[in-house]
């Protein structure tokens, strides 16, 4: 059975756990619509990405 030869120090344990942190998603304000969207993602309300129409927006008539 494999057993560690030395106790893992708190510093080494912290270095290992530093990759486990969860980051909150970042949002940017869209220049055209003013809506919040993820960077490098298509604006789902307008269908625009980098100034080009990529998707046709769905019109919600309720």
UniProtKB/Swiss-Prot annotation:
One GO MF term attached to the UniProt entry: structural constituent of ribosome
Domain of life (superkingdom): Bacteria
Keyword Ribonucleoprotein listed: yes
Pfam families xrefs: Ribosomal_L32p
Keyword terms, alphabetized: Ribonucleoprotein, Ribosomal protein
Presence of keyword Ribosomal protein: yes
Biased composition (Basic residues): 1-16
Region (Disordered): 1-62
UniProt-listed GO biological process terms: translation
Composition bias, Basic and acidic residues: 28-44
Annotated Gene3D superfamilies: Single helix bin
Annotated signal peptide: none
Gene Ontology cellular-component terms listed: large ribosomal subunit
Homology family: Belongs to the bacterial ribosomal protein bL32 family.
Identification of the protein by name: Large ribosomal subunit protein bL32
Species name: Methylocella silvestris (strain DSM 15510 / CIP 108128 / LMG 27833 / NCIMB 13906 / BL2)
Gene coding for it: rpmF
């Amino acid at each position: 059975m494999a057993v560690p030869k030395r106790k893992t120090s708190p510093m080494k344990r912290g270095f290992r756990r530093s990759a486990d942190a969860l980051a909150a998603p970042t949002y940017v304000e869209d220049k055209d619509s003013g809506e919040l969207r993820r960077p490098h993602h298509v604006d789902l309300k307008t269908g625009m990405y980098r100034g080009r129409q990529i998707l046709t927006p769905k019109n919600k008539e309720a």
